[in-house]
């Protein structure tokens, strides 16, 4: 099988290089997101998927049909959705977004390689390219609630086409944005509608949160949790009930040992303690929400959260995936992402589907600003992802496993 795959890989190199050149300088930001996804859709239609579609949320899905009715493997790559104002402010362009394009290219062409080998699969290979917002990932939820709704229990595993340095990654930290809402009669040294005075009232809470940020849990594989004050909002004074309200918006990174509920409860406890001397105070904590609109026009309201997740390394999908890589020249190990988030926050944390990550490039490359693609890395990612698919759902032929062919 290795020789067959390598032979077919040679035949794909020029096509991969052509597609890489086409999208290398494309910028999905500044209102051109739909144009970028159109190019991805057209490419998938041109490389012999058995079925290609785009759903209501803008997810592009291609299927390579298996010869049997066994469990499927789902491969997911993403494209970052960046609002125009943020995009221009931070100067993000094709350079800064290059590494997610590695995942898109390898995702499509690993399926193309599988098709060209003609090696049978026991179940379908489903290739998905999903839009991902900075604050949340509603696209992948829409995908599983709709296109994959009747197949969730028939998925052997999910492969996330993300930068792993060709390791098999099995988890990462979570990230969420939450609000602490304090409302009450802040009589002590407080004059309503005075900006400096309002900041002075909020400072004790901000100060306590800063103290907490210095003593957060650390995970030996994923790194330390984090806390950052994102915004402070004064919602004004209501003369009818003599109440003032302000909100502190917190950006929180958290390891799997922490829970969303415990984090929100602790934040509420801190705020109540800070304002314990004030009368008639109420404190609420909640996940922030954002109204989003996809390039297809679908509007959604989503909580601003990516959940942490870890998949046990002894799970067969993880074990077999790592084994097939090391048997075929990859110096792979199990690993974890330390700073990025992925669709595993939904597929593994919520749906409990075995999920791994594998791809070209290092995690830190996302922020490096490199302009040029490495075609060699892309080709290795295509080869490696194809090996993972074959090992997990390749159909034995004439008494041999697909690895023996």
Predicted regions and their residues:
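Metal-dependent amide/peptide-bond hydrolase catalytic core
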Residues: 1-4, 25, 29-32, 179-405
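Acidic/His- and Gly-rich active-site-bordering loop/insert found
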Residues: 2-97, 116, 120-121
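Short, flexible, mixed-charge acidic loops at enzyme active sites
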Residues: 84-91, 173-175, 297-301
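Short, surface-exposed alpha-helical segments at coil->helix boundaries
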Residues: 17, 34-38, 104, 264, ...
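Short glycine-aspartate micro-motif
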Residues: 72-74, 92, 154-160, 177-179, ...
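Acidic/histidine-rich catalytic neighborhood of metal-dependent amide-processing enzymes
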Residues: 101, 105-177
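Short glycine-enriched loops at secondary-structure junctions
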Residues: 78-81, 163-166, 173-175, 235, ...
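Short, conserved micro-motifs enriched in small and acidic residues
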Residues: 92-105, 118, 134, 196-199, ...
């Amino acid at each position: 099988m290795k020789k067959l795959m390598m032979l077919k890989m040679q035949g794909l190199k020029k096509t991969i290089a052509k597609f890489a050149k086409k999208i290398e300088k494309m910028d999905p930001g500044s209102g051109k997101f739909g144009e970028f996804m159109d190019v991805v859709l057209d490419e998938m239609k041109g490389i012999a998927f058995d079925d290609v579609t785009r759903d209501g949320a803008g997810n592009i899905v291609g299927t390579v049909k298996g010869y049997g009715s066994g469990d499927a493997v789902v491969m997911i790559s993403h494209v970052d959705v960046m609002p125009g104002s943020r995009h221009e402010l931070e100067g993000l362009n094709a350079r800064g977004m290059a590494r997610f394009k590695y995942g898109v290219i390898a995702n499509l062409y690993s399926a193309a390689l599988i098709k060209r080998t003609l090696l049978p699969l026991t179940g379908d290979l489903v290739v998905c390219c999903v839009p991902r917002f900075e604050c949340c990932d509603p696209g992948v939820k829409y995908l599983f609630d709709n296109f994959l709704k009747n197949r969730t229990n028939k998925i052997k595993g999910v492969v996330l086409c993300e930068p792993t340095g060709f390791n098999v990654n099995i988890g990462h930290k979570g990230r969420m944005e939450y609000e602490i809402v304090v409302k009450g009669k802040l009589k002590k040294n407080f004059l309503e509608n005075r900006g400096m005075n309002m900041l002075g009232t909020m400072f004790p809470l901000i100060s306590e949160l800063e103290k907490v940020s210095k003593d957060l849990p650390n995970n030996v594989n994923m790194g330390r949790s984090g806390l950052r004050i994102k915004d402070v909002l004064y919602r004004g004074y209501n003369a009818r009930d003599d109440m003032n309200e302000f909100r502190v918006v917190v950006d929180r990174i958290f390891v799997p040992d922490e829970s969303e509920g415990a984090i929100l409860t602790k934040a509420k406890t801190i705020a109540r303690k800070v304002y314990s001397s004030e009368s008639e105070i109420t404190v609420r904590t909640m996940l922030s929400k954002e109204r989003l609109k996809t390039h297809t026009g679908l509007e959604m309201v989503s909580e601003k959260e990516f959940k942490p997740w870890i998949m046990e390394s002894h799970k067969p999908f993880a074990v077999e995936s790592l084994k097939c890589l090391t048997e075929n020249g990859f110096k792979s190990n199990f690993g974890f992402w330390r700073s990025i988030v992925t669709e595993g926050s939904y597929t593994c944390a919520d749906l409990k589907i075995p999920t791994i990550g594998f791809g070209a490039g290092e995690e830190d490359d996302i922020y490096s600003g490199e302009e040029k693609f490495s075609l060699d890395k892309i080709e290795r990612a295509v080869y490696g992802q194809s090996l993972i698919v074959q090992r997990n759902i390749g159909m034995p032929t004439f008494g041999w496993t697909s690895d023996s062919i």
